[in-house]
UniProtKB/Swiss-Prot annotation:
It holds the Pfam family Ribosomal_S11. It comes from Thermus thermophilus (strain ATCC 27634 / DSM 579 / HB8). This is Small ribosomal subunit protein uS11. PANTHER family: 40S RIBOSOMAL PROTEIN S14/30S RIBOSOMAL PROTEIN S11. The gene is rpsK. Residues 109-129 are annotated as: Disordered. Residues 119-129 have a biased composition (Basic residues). Located on the upper part of the platform of the 30S subunit, where it bridges several disparate RNA helices of the 16S rRNA. Forms part of the Shine-Dalgarno cleft in the 70S ribosome, where it interacts both with the Shine-Dalgarno helix and mRNA.
Length: 129
């Protein structure tokens, strides 16, 4: 039986999209989506090759953002709206890395979830105030 000729998968071209930066104390995850919110590519401190507490460093966040931006530019991405969630160490560095990668950053929105006095925080987070 003859083999069917396989069709080449065509990479869809997306000119603009959104970059979600989830910065926790343990890691920073950068997800780049199209304008509808469908993921195109993502990267994190762990994907870069760091393990343990090093994933939460600003340098790991910078490398993760550069990696995600490079992958997104392969899809024709030129500009992004940045949405930041979390209070981790890598949030500022990830934004700077996206700007330095060649992607045009149109806007930056802080969408960190803040409770309206919901669950009681753990002891280490109650001690602060």
């Amino acid at each position: 039986m003859a083999k069917k000729p396989s069709k080449k998968k065509v990479k869809r071209q997306v000119a603009s999209g959104r970059a979600y930066i989830h910065a926790s104390y343990n890691n920073t995850i950068v997800t780049i989506t199209d304008p509808d919110g469908n993921p195109i590519t993502w990267s994190s401190g762990g994907v870069i090759g760091y393990k343990g507490s090093r994933k939460g460093t600003p340098y790991a966040a910078q490398l993760a953002a550069l990696d995600a931006a490079k992958k997104a530019m392969a899809y024709g991405m030129q500009s992004v709206d940045v949405i930041v969630r979390g209070t981790g160490a890598g949030r500022e560095q990830a934004i700077r890395a996206l700007q330095a990668s060649g992607l045009q950053v149109k806007s930056i929105v802080d969408d960190t979830p803040v409770p309206h006095n919901g669950c009681r925080p753990k002891k280490k987070f109650r001690k602060a105030s």
